[in-house]
Amino acid sequence: MPQTALVLASTLGPGCSAQGRPGMGERGARGSEDLVFQDGRLVSGSLEALMEHLVPTADYYPDRTYIFTFLLSSRVFIRPHDLLARVGRICLEQRRQLEAGPEKAKLKCFSARVVQLLKEWTEAFPYDFQDETVMAELKAITHRVAQCDEEGGTVKKAIAQMTQSLPLALAARGQRQELRDKLCSPALDRGPVLKAKPPAAQKDILGVCCDPLVLAQQLTHIELERVGSIRPEDLMQILSHMDSRDKHRCRGDPAKTRSLEAYDDWFDCLSMLVATEVVKKKHRTRVLEFLIDVARECFNIGNFNSMMAIISGMNLSPVARLKKTWSKVKTAKFDVLEHHMDPSSNFCNYRTALQGAMQRSQTANSSREKVVIPVFNLFVKDMYFLHKIHTNHLPNGHVNFKKFWEISRQIHEFMAWTQVECPFEKDKKIQSYLLTAPVYSEEALFVASFESEGPENHMEKDSWKALRTTLLNRA
């Protein structure tokens, strides 16, 4: 996200630039007692002072990075619609002061800045405005600030543009959600009811695609489509779930976690699909080598999430125990992949590779070099670690805004990766197979695995015996 935007520069008039730096201008000076800065950067403050710092005046407009960070992090402490109501009251107070004071001429400039703030809010977090009561509050605020403008004036035009764009953004999100739900439902329901042995005519991955690069490209398509539906506030919702001591009311909103759960489920489905493809009777060695090549191509593309899912599928017990099969596989490539995903030293090797992909993306000469899809589970763990080692509040009661600057930076970085347009041609046939192909349940995976290579030790023999007994009793 750019440091500054002049989206409504034409509405502000001479001397009313939308630019501003954290802590600069009238608002920053007035709130200095409740706001703490280090090297010109806001690091803490009371929630009330932070809210006042968000609202522009006739002579002050907050930095855009502060707007994004505060709107994102404030939901840990206050619901968005409550924040909007508070912003409305502060704006009304400002307007009354301008009307009663000697600077009434600045009223239009102030109104334009308020609309600019609301516009940035609706663009960055349109989901905050899906409720009718919030929309009513938004209309009430804009109605009040627009009273100083003539009919057809710049402020009223900006308000009209904002109110027209917001429903479109909400509708687009709803359409993406419906599409994702259609794709997710079969994948989540298919596993437990499947038999161990597939019909002879059932397709397998090699029958659908025999080119590792093409399959890696289609996996990248699916990744970007799914991760692209995640919004910044969805990620912030993770923090609301983490702290069991936090009694904040908006925790657990299913609508704000559905995108995250769907993306997490995709990882599990891909891992199970990999395991299913391997334990099928025919061509196990060939399938393993093919999938290793697919994982390597994912790594080269920058699709680390699919790569990790493939490796995870190969490391599931029903696959990992197939010693005879693995003995025939040329594992040098797999060893390299496991080295990149080695969990030691906090996944140091993976983080080095991710940093390299990020640098490549920043200096990309082609769209193919821009792809960066991190391992989502590790990103969430990093967020969790950052959340746990830093408190939300300082001993003096101030919000620890330094913490939320860092959280916002990481979320913004993640969101930038999700907005990359997939540079590869879409193959509907391959994607359909990846998304809808039947996968084995955990029990079925073990049945197929033991039927391919019998149990080799007492523990495996006991497990196989118990599994057969369970299946016979169920039948």
Positions of predicted regions on the chain:
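Eukaryotic small-GTPase/lipid signaling interfaces
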Residues: 1-475
